[in-house]
């Protein structure tokens, strides 16, 4: 027991006895309550600190966003620059430029411009007030010209082409070998051929050969159809030809394949219309790029046509097309090879003899034989069969050859009921 003195006038006895165990319990409970309150306050403090850090991070983020938006706003408020062309570079660092509005000026240039990028004909950006050269603009090419580059190689190789072994060997010698083994030509002391013309009837595999070259070589392959160079406005076709060869030089070693070159390479005549004159301007630019004053570097040209008789003689001379490869109609052995290539994935019956089919398809091109194989498969599907037999091929030959003979007869003036 413990004696506890009580204050006077408290209404209690001056002295009293309180059990020690009850007071200890009171103190322990009080300490426990204070500890729990302390833990809660610490937890609240920790949460407030985390919220403070989060708010500070957001503040930094918002300040960064404000600076970004302010910079973008200032950039958008910047007055536009004038596009001009350099005519001449003077010795004192000044330049003679021609603005897009027409007049010519002698102006200063920024000291941060690389002198190697400054040359007559370069596009530059000019200040609106002083017309000082601020920067040199990159050379812009026509998007249609940039789209001519073949990025994904075709899935055609020389094994997919039948009956053209001699043409394939010539193509390897003139196109592939100079790109893969140029040291051979240096040892012999000759310049490799830079131009190859493939000519022959339609459907004989000229474009297939070009696809195989694109698949085999690691050079940049640029494909264009001749009619794409025929433009509406004067000078547009010549500009596309110039940009086409510039692209080929930048990405050399490269191969330019011009399909249906007869659309722009026809003989030049005296009596012509305004449209013919524009085609002739494009042809002249093509002739200059193929074998003109400026060397074209490690750029090979491959062209195809089925009308070599109408091509301009200047286009066919050595130096432009050094080698002309004829792609003839396939022989019986070649037709059999072509049929085997197209039918190698087909489910054929035992009675199918591709040799006999090759013999009865005289004067058929590779495209005709491909159509015959496809039609034979269609006849089998029509009869609900998964095996192609000889009757399907006979029907396909009759259909394809009959349509071809009918079209040829109509062209010659024969009428059918």
Swiss-Prot record:
Cross-referenced SMART domains: AAA (SM00382)
Protein's GO biological process: proteasomal protein catabolic process; protein unfolding
Chain residues that bind ATP: 203-208, 342
Signal peptide (from-to): none
Location of the region described as Docks into pockets in the proteasome alpha-ring to cause gate opening in the Swiss-Prot/TrEMBL record: 415-417
A GO cellular-component term linked to this record: proteasome-activating nucleotidase complex
Coiled coil feature spans: 24-78
Keyword hit for Repeat: no
InterPro entries with a match to the protein in the record: 26S_Proteasome_ATPase, AAA+_ATPase, AAA_lid_3, ATPase_AAA_core, ATPase_AAA_CS, NA-bd_OB-fold, Nucleotidase_PAN, P-loop_NTPase
Localization, UniProt: Cytoplasm
Ranges that cross the membrane: none
Entry keywords, A to Z: ATP-binding, Chaperone, Coiled coil, Cytoplasm, Nucleotide-binding, Proteasome
Recorded GO MF terms: ATP binding; ATP hydrolysis activity
The keyword Nucleotide-binding is assigned to this record: yes
Domain of life from the UniProt record: Archaea
NCBIfam families reported for this sequence: PRK03992.1, proteasome-activating nucleotidase
Subunit architecture: Homohexamer. The hexameric complex has a two-ring architecture resembling a top hat that caps the 20S proteasome core at one or both ends. Upon ATP-binding, the C-terminus of PAN interacts with the alpha-rings of the proteasome core by binding to the intersubunit pockets.
Family that this chain belongs to: Belongs to the AAA ATPase family.
The protein's role, per its UniProt record: ATPase which is responsible for recognizing, binding, unfolding and translocation of substrate proteins into the archaeal 20S proteasome core particle. Is essential for opening the gate of the 20S proteasome via an interaction with its C-terminus, thereby allowing substrate entry and access to the site of proteolysis. Thus, the C-termini of the proteasomal ATPase function like a 'key in a lock' to induce gate opening and therefore regulate proteolysis.
Domain comment as written in the entry: Consists of three main regions, an N-terminal coiled-coil domain that may assist in substrate recognition, an interdomain involved in PAN hexamerization, and a C-terminal ATPase domain of the AAA type.
Protein name: Proteasome-activating nucleotidase
């Amino acid at each position: 027991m413990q004696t506890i003195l009580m204050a006077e006038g408290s209404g209690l006895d001056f002295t009293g006895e309180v059990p020690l165990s009850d007071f200890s319990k009171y103190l322990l409970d009080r300490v426990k309550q204070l500890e729990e309150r302390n833990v809660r306050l610490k937890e609240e403090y920790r949460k407030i600190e985390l919220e403070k850090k989060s708010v500070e991070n957001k503040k930094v983020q918002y300040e960064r966003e404000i600076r970004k938006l302010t910079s973008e706003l200032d950039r958008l408020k910047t007055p536009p620059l004038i596009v001009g062309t350099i005519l001449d570079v003077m010795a004192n660092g000044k330049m003679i430029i021609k603005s897009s509005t027409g007049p010519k000026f002698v102006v200063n240039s920024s000291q941060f411009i690389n002198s190697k990028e400054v040359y007559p004909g370069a596009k530059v950006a000019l200040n609106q007030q002083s017309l000082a050269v601020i920067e040199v603009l990159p050379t812009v090419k026509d998007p249609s010209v940039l789209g001519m580059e073949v990025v994904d190689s075709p899935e055609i190789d020389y094994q997919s082409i039948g009956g053209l072994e001699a043409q394939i060997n010539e193509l390897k010698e003139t196109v592939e070998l100079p790109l893969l083994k140029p040291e051979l030509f240096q040892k012999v002391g000759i310049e490799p051929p830079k131009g190859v013309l493939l000519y022959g009837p339609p459907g004989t595999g000229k474009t297939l050969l070009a696809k195989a070259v694109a698949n085999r070589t690691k050079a940049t392959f640029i494909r264009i159809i001749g009619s794409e160079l025929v433009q509406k406005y004067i000078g547009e076709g010549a500009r596309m030809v110039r940009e086409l060869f510039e692209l080929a030089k930048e990405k050399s070693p490269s191969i330019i394949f011009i399909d249906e070159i007869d659309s722009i390479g026809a003989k030049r005549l005296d009596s012509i219309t305004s449209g013919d004159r524009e085609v002739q301007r494009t042809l002249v630019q093509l002739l200059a790029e193929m074998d003109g004053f400026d060397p074209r570097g490690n750029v090979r040209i491959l062209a195809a046509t089925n009308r070599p008789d109408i091509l301009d003689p200047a286009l066919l001379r050595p130096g432009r097309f050094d080698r002309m490869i004829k792609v003839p109609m396939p022989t019986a052995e070649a037709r059999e090879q072509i049929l085997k290539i197209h039918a190698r994935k087909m489910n054929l019956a035992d009675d199918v003899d591709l040799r006999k089919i090759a013999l009865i398809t005289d004067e058929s091109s590779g495209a005709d034989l491909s159509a015959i194989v496809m039609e034979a498969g269609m006849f089998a599907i029509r009869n609900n069969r998964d095996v192609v037999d000889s009757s399907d091929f006979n029907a396909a030959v009759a259909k394809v050859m009959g349509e071809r003979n009918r079209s040829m007869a109509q062209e010659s003036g024969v009428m059918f009921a």
